[in-house]
Design a protein with these regions (language model features):
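Repeated scaffold domains used in trafficking and secretory/extracellular systems
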Residues: 111-115
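Intrinsically disordered or low-complexity boundary/linker segments at protein termini
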Residues: 1-91, 96-110, 121-125, 131-200
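Short glycine-biased active-site loop of nucleotidyltransferases that positions the nucleotide triphosphate
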Residues: 117-119
Length: 200
């Protein structure tokens, strides 16, 4: 999914009609990607995670998919999350993916995520874990993500990741004690890369 208008290069006011329809019509996990370089050239992935992300039912599913990205690309994973969220990420990594190179940094205010701009380059991808309106980890600032990406991350590969969020947003039962658990290297295209991540 393209995050900018291909004619003007300016950010779209939304993520486009196709993905907007997908997000409004389904609570399944969605990944919107803007790739600057081939996936096989990436060496580092920064993951920005909002507070209370661990309460979403799709928490461990997207975390597993991020780990698969790290394994396929043999790259370093840097997680930035609230101090109450980090222990769930660390625990999962230690139990399921202890061989992956990873780092964990507290990010207790969502406004801090744009500072990751200082750590990005063409061999870096940033994954922004977001949420649909009405769910527990949603923040109003998420509505401006396409514009922020256009202004601050113009030369960086970016993924917006919407986790599984089941049921009506006003009536969902959230998992307050996260549970459950929810590849060849360097595929040639983004399409084949994501197919391997999601089906392996």
């Amino acid at each position: 999914v393209c995050l900018t208008d291909r004619t003007t290069g300016m950010p779209k006011s939304s993520l486009g009609p196709v993905i907007d329809n997908v997000l409004s019509g389904s609570h399944r996990e969605v990944m919107a990607v803007r790739g600057i370089v081939p996936p096989g050239t990436l060496r580092r992935v920064l993951v920005a995670i909002p507070q209370k992300a661990e309460y979403e039912v799709g928490f461990y599913k997207w975390l597993e998919h991020v780990c698969r990205i790290g394994e396929q690309l043999d790259c370093h994973l840097d997680f930035y999350a609230h101090k109450e969220t980090l222990p769930y990420i660390c625990g999962y990594m230690q139990n399921k993916h202890s061989s992956l190179r990873s780092q964990y940094t507290e990010m207790n205010s969502w406004k801090e995520w744009t500072r990751l701009q200082e750590q990005t380059g063409k061999d870096t991808m940033i994954i922004v874990v977001t949420a649909r309106p009405g769910f527990i980890s949603y923040k109003p600032e998420f509505d401006n993500l396409p514009y922020i990406i256009y202004k601050k991350f113009a030369h960086t590969s970016v993924m917006l990741l919407y986790p599984d969020q089941w049921g009506d947003p006003q009536e969902s039962v959230y998992v307050f004690t996260p549970n459950g658990s929810a590849v060849t290297r360097r595929p040639r295209t983004l399409k084949s890369w994501f197919k391997q991540i999601l089906t392996s």
